[in-house]
């Protein structure tokens, strides 16, 4: 028996990392929002690694925060350890990574959602969507509740027709033995969506009290207080270490001897797994020349003894898992608390989406997270906030918001998905971004806070602080550009200590700062200090902008050229069959993706420069024909 459950502006299906960002963004923009989840005890659940951030991913978390999202704030309040990675490399690849207290992370996020105005969190399983005249107008749950809305965001993670595989055992399930969503997957097929089958996996968890840590290497957090969120002022100083160990020759022998029992090699697993997070059995086969592989032992929280065995993702039978664990130094007497497993799930082919993450087939229907073929909490959250923003914009009758590839890693991620698609769970890497020196960890606020403020996601107080920081950066750059450093014993002694060549003549202060060895702390010892003491973030920005000025300027020139191509718009209903001379493969791909600009068309796989030249001529002819008529 069905009944009317209520009417909303936006409905979000799922409360994982994509869902919570989507729901919070829509509600904060003023949309009356309903968030439905299979289990209220699994809001923002971390079914795999208990961590947030890392290369590229950490920058996404900063971008989410700069837009007004929650992931950064939440991990700042609930982490057990934080480290800045790649500190010995340039600023383009530096990234923050935090070990999460996964249980506190969930609790804190759930509390935030429950206290958010305009947002109702409810437990419920969505079986069908309400479609009227090609538009999504709500959802129907398995209890018969009908909820109406102007826009719906689907963020179902790995629950769509989820199947856990552990050795010879397999059964329908979401992650961690939670209830899967079967009917919604079937319904999406009925609606004509192309689905693919992907797979991911997780390692065993072991009892921390049974680890011999003396045989491992300690991995402490950074002494310097760090944070993902630009709003964080209180820092956690009581950190817990992680530990490093390695597989052994015996580990590899046990795995090799049991490959016949591995679902990956027996044919039980049909889904495509993530290239950049292979299972341990896959590593042993693909990298047979390596005598050992790194294993990180990561605590899952402050109030549990469970330890996550990072690097040992597996779907081998339980008895094999226990045997191979005991061959790893430090784990000889270990007790396994949960076995690792593989999980298969349905995802949609993401080229069926516009860059707003709205589906091309059904207006008002958005998808975000692992349903779009990505892997990782951060990639999911980045899509989630954009889908939530655009669902709210749709509900309000406003234009969608698209981040381009020069604005954010989130823009790179979404553009890759909707333009190129993916044949495997997509992981964001710094190498996927053309403009890495622009898309840095340290400047996410300078890139995106203005946009977050315009959307109503950034408070007046935070925006005022941001504008003050912007102004301080410009003033300090102007101040030092007028200074000259003269050679002296004091100056040359400092340069000698830093391993930098001594000065024989006066130099512009900016030329001295550009030296690789010169940090701003040292720089302030040889120039007058500013009248007002500035924040470390201001000094950091000035140093990076001055040091890498030439490289940054080159990237901006590239961006300007790209923008010219992005500004050449393509009508959504363009008839590609009417364009003579385009290669058959290019025509098929362009009809499938339906790019919105010539820039996007140039990134579609199978489309070459000759095809783009023909497309440009055709569009120009059409424009001239319209003008003359």
UniProtKB/Swiss-Prot annotation:
Cofactor: FAD
SMART domains named in the record: GIDA_assoc_3
One protein family per Pfam: GIDA_C_1st
Residues where NAD(+) binds: 273-287
Molecular function terms from GO: flavin adenine dinucleotide binding
Membrane-spanning residues: none
Entry's localization field: Cytoplasm
Residues bound to FAD: 14-19, 126, 181, 370
GO biological process, one term: tRNA methylation
InterPro entries linked to this entry: FAD/NAD-bd_sf (IPR036188), GIDA_C_N (IPR049312), MnmG (IPR004416), MnmG-rel (IPR002218), MnmG-rel_CS (IPR020595), MnmG_C (IPR026904), MnmG_C_subdom (IPR047001), MnmG_C_subdom_sf (IPR044920)
Alphabetically ordered keywords of this record: Cytoplasm, FAD, Flavoprotein, NAD, tRNA processing
Signal peptide: none
GO CC term, one of those recorded: cytosol
Top-rank lineage group of the source organism: Bacteria
Biological function: NAD-binding protein involved in the addition of a carboxymethylaminomethyl (cmnm) group at the wobble position (U34) of certain tRNAs, forming tRNA-cmnm(5)s(2)U34.
NCBIfam families from the UniProt entry: mnmG_gidA
Annotated family: Belongs to the MnmG family.
Assembly notes: Homodimer. Heterotetramer of two MnmE and two MnmG subunits.
Protein name, UniProt field: tRNA uridine 5-carboxymethylaminomethyl modification enzyme MnmG
Organism of provenance: Shouchella clausii (strain KSM-K16)
Gene label: mnmG
């Amino acid at each position: 028996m069905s009944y009317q459950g209520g009417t909303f502006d936006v409905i979000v299906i799922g409360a994982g990392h994509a869902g919570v960002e989507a729901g919070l963004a829509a509600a904060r923009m003023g949309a009356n929002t309903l968030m439905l989840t299979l289990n209220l005890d699994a809001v923002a659940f971390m079914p795999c690694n208990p961590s947030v951030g890392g290369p590229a991913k950490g920058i996404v978390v900063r971008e989410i925060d700069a837009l007004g999202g929650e992931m950064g704030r939440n991990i700042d309040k609930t982490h057990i350890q934080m480290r800045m990675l790649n500190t010995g490399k340039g600023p383009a690849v530096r990234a923050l990574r935090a070990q999460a207290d996964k249980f506190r992370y969930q609790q804190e996020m759930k509390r935030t959602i429950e206290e958010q105005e305009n947002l109702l969190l409810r437990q419920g399983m969505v079986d069908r969507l309400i479609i009227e005249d090609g538009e999504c107008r709500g959802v129907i749950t398995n209890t018969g509740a009908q909820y109406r809305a102007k826009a719906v965001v689907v963020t179902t993670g790995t629950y769509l027709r989820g199947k856990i595989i552990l050795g010879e055992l397999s059964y329908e399930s979401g992650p961690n033995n939670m209830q899967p969503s079967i009917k919604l997957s079937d319904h999406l097929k009925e609606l004509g969506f192309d689905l693919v089958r992907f797979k991911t996996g997780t390692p065993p968890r072991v009892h921390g009290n049974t680890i011999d840590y003396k045989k491992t290497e300690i991995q402490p957090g950074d002494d310097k207080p760090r944070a993902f969120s630009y709003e964080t002022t209180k820092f956690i100083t009581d950190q817990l270490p992680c530990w490093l160990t390695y597989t052994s020759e015996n580990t590899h022998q046990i795995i090799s001897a049991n490959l016949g029992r591995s679902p990956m090699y027996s044919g039980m697993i049909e889904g495509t797994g993530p290239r950049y997070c292979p299972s341990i059995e896959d590593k042993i086969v693909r990298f047979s020349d390596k005598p050992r592989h790194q294993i990180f032992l990561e605590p899952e929280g402050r109030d549990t003894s469970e330890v996550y065995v990072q690097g040992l993702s597996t779907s081998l039978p339980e008895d094999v898992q226990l045997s191979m664990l005991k061959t790893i130094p430090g784990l000889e007497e270990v007790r396994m608390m949960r076995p690792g497993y593989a999980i298969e799930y349905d995802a949609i082919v993401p080229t069926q989406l516009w860059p707003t993450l709205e589906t091309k087939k059904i207006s008002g229907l958005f998808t975000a997270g692992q349903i779009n073929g990505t892997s990782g909490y951060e990639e999911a959250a980045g899509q989630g906030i954009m889908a939530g923003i655009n669902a709210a914009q749709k509900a309000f009758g406003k234009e969608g918001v698209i981040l381009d590839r020069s604005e954010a890693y989130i823009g790179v991620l979404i553009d890759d998905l909707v333009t190129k698609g993916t044949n495997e769970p997509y992981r964001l890497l710094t190498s996927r971004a053309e403009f890495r020196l622009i898309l840095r960890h340290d400047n996410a606020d300078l890139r995106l806070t203005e946009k977050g403020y315009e959307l109503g996601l950034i408070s007046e107080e935070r925006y005022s602080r941001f504008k003050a920081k912007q102004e301080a950066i410009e003033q300090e750059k102007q101040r030092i550009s007028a200074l000259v450093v003269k050679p002296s014993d004091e100056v040359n002694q400092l340069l000698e200590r830093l391993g930098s060549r001594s000065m024989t003549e006066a130099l512009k202060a900016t030329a001295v700062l550009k030296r690789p060895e010169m940090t701003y702390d040292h720089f302030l010892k040889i120039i007058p200090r500013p009248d007002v003491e500035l924040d470390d973030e201001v000094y950091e920005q000035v140093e990076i902008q001055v040091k890498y000025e030439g490289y940054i300027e080159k990237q901006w020139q590239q961006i300007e050229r790209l923008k010219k191509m992005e500004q050449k718009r393509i009508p959504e209903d363009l008839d590609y069959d009417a364009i003579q001379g385009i290669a058959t493969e290019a025509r098929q791909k362009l009809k499938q993706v339906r790019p919105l600009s010539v820039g996007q068309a140039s990134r579609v796989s199978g489309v070459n420069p000759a095809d783009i030249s023909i497309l440009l001529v055709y569009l120009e002819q059409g424009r001239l024909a319209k003008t003359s008529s």
